[in-house]
Amino acid sequence: APHGACQTSGTLRSMSGSMAESLLGSDHSKAAFLEFGTGTHSPQGHYPLHSFHPPTEGPYGGSGYGGRTLGYPYSPHGHPQHHASPYLPYHQGQHGGSLGHGGSRLDEDTELEKNTVIENGEIRINGKGKKIRKPRTIYSSVQLQALNQRFQQTQYLALPERAELAAHLGLTQTQVKIWFQNKRSKYKKIMKQGSSIQEGEHLHSSASMSPCSPNIPPHWDSPMGTKGGPIGHGSYINNYGPWYQPHHQDSMPRPQMM
């Protein structure tokens, strides 16, 4: 009798242990299933409930072991479906990034327009700008005549003289100042060209006074001389006739007279 009681008590202990393990395994699978279900948007019906089988089998059956191994949910294809869900926010992030870049370009254009300021006839973008060309001032013949006469008197005007001349001609002081600056630059350019022309004429006149004519090339520079061929007497006379007058022409008729 005691032996049978010990055997029944051992069986009850093993059954209670297997039931506790199956219950703990089912609790773990439930917790994992709930955590996975809240983290993803996929319906819960896709996951088979293998871990919720009642512990009808023996103490060493597959229920307790299966409850532990199948604590995590799985898809019927063998791969967890939570890998497909992260791609959606990634693509959304890409589209959002492209939209963000477009918005930033528009913001840059608006900021560029805001920073573009025209100050004193200059376009300034962030403090750096290019000058705007102002329209050229068209002077009348009377104004040009008066300005030229005053320039012949003096090339530089003092401030009171410039103000007086501008008021007399109906111009601004800036217009008078710019006209005198341009006139001085043109005058200096003409004087420089004139001095270079005079120097060239002086060199030409000094070369023409030399005994050798600059228009006639020397004998070794002539094309016939470079070839090395004989130079005829007639061609030599024709080329150097104005500078060479042979004396044998006077002696040639004398033998004929004899």
Curated annotation (Swiss-Prot):
Main localisation:
nucleus
Cellular component (GO) terms are: nucleus
Q: Which CDD domains does the UniProt entry name for this protein?
A: homeodomain
UniProt entry keywords in alphabetical sequence: Developmental protein, DNA-binding, Homeobox, Nucleus
Task: Name the DNA-binding stretches.
Answer: 132-191
Q: Where is this region: Disordered?
A: 194-228
So which domain of life are we looking at?
Eukaryota
SUPFAM superfamilies given in the database record: Homeodomain-like (SSF46689)
What SMART domains does the database record attribute to this sequence? HOX
Task: Please give the Gene Ontology molecular function terms for this protein.
Answer: DNA-binding transcription factor activity, RNA polymerase II-specific; RNA polymerase II cis-regulatory region sequence-specific DNA binding
Tell me the tissue specificity.
Expressed in regeneration blastemas. Detected in forelimbs, hindlimbs, the tail, flank, and brain as well as in limb and tail blastemas.
Against PROSITE patterns, the record matches this protein to: HOMEOBOX_1, HOMEOBOX_2
Where would you find this protein in the cell? Nucleus
Q: Does the keyword Nucleus apply?
A: yes
Name any Gene Ontology BP term: cell differentiation
Q: Cross-referenced InterPro entries, in alphabetical order?
A: Distal-less_Homeobox_TF, HD, HD_metazoa, Homeobox_CS, Homeodomain-like_sf, HTH_motif
Nucleus recorded as keyword:
yes
The UniProt entry's sequence similarity note says: Belongs to the distal-less homeobox family.
State what protein this is by name.
Answer: Homeobox protein box-5
Organism of provenance? Notophthalmus viridescens (Eastern newt)
